[in-house]
């Protein structure tokens, strides 16, 4: 999928990986990049506009833990202005197993809500045009880091939810896939806490392993969006993007 002249909504597009991804996206000659983020960063928005003045970059303050009704209201505003949106990127995430409810709210519930809200506009059963959802997960969604079980479980939920959305593409017209980074040099890794403090040095231990840069992540995120493979589970580790073949152990038969 060529991104030229596309309209993209990017949840958490100003964070470490998010900002580098936004930089890569505007280089693709989008029509509009709409960034929803909790923290305003006027300097970053100005930088994105300067990278490619042909792209309209818009910022809306947004906390992904806001109720579904509020998310829907915001999307109504965005769709009223843009008329169409082609891609939704769900990129919000925290890594702090001290904050159990917030971890689940940010990493999973918020993603479900933005997906649910945008279906009001995309669902072909309602006359919508369909669309593409890129959900940013984590390799811990395949194999948990046991010292952060809440974070790992929230990312496993992202993979499971996205697989279901992908299988509904023939019903809704909406395709979906996950991109799941390995250990990346961001503030997320430096600041997180383990569950019940079972490992006080978990951040340091992770950083002792090979990592990847936020730029490498960003470039591969955009590559995955351009590939637009419905149902793909992408592993993005050490700067390499590769598909994961999920093993089926049970079939509902539905």
UniProtKB/Swiss-Prot annotation:
Keywords: NAD, Oxidoreductase. It catalyses: a primary alcohol + NAD(+) = an aldehyde + NADH + H(+); a secondary alcohol + NAD(+) = a ketone + NADH + H(+). Pfam families: adh_short. InterPro entries: ADH_Drosophila-type, NAD(P)-bd_dom_sf, Sc_DH/Rdtase_CS, SDR_fam. Gene3D superfamilies: NAD(P)-binding Rossmann-like Domain. GO terms for cellular component: cytosol. GO terms for biological process: acetaldehyde metabolic process; acetyl-CoA biosynthetic process from ethanol; alcohol catabolic process; behavioral response to ethanol; NADH metabolic process. Disulfide bonds: none annotated. Its EC number is 1.1.1.1. It comes from the Eukaryota. GO terms for molecular function: alcohol dehydrogenase (NAD+) activity; aldehyde dehydrogenase (NAD+) activity; protein homodimerization activity. The active site is at 151 (proton acceptor). It is an enzyme of class 1 (oxidoreductase). Belongs to the short-chain dehydrogenases/reductases (SDR) family. This is Alcohol dehydrogenase. The lineage of its organism: Eukaryota, Metazoa, Ecdysozoa, Arthropoda, Hexapoda. The gene is Adh.
């Amino acid at each position: 999928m060529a991104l030229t002249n596309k309209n993209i909504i990017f949840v958490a597009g100003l964070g470490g990986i998010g900002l580098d991804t936004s930089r890569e996206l505007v280089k693709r000659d989008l029509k509009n990049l709409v960034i929803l983020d909790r923290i305003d960063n006027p300097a970053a928005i100005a930088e994105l506009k300067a990278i490619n003045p042909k792209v309209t970059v818009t910022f809306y303050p947004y906390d992904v833990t806001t109720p579904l009704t509020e998310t829907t209201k915001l999307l109504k505003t965005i769709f009223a202005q843009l008329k169409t949106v082609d891609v939704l990127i769900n990129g919000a995430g925290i890594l702090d197993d001290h904050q159990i409810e917030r971890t689940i709210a940010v990493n999973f519930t918020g993603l479900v809500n933005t997906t649910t809200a945008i279906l009001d506009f995309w669902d072909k059963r309602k006359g919508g045009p369909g669309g593409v959802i890129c959900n940013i997960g984590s390799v811990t969604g395949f194999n948990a880091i046991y010292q952060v079980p809440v974070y790992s479980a929230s990312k496993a939920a992202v993979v499971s939810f996205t697989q279901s959305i992908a299988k509904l593409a023939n019903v809704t017209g909406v395709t979906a896939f996950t991109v799941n980074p390995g250990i990346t040099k961001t503030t997320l890794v430096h600041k997180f806490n383990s569950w019940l403090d079972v490992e006080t040095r978990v951040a340091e231990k992770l950083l002792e392993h090979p990592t990847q840069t936020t730029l490498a992540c960003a470039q591969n995120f955009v590559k995955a969006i351009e590939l637009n493979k419905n149902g793909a589970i992408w592993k993005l580790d050490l700067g390499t993007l590769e598909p994961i073949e999920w093993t089926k152990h049970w079939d509902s038969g539905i």
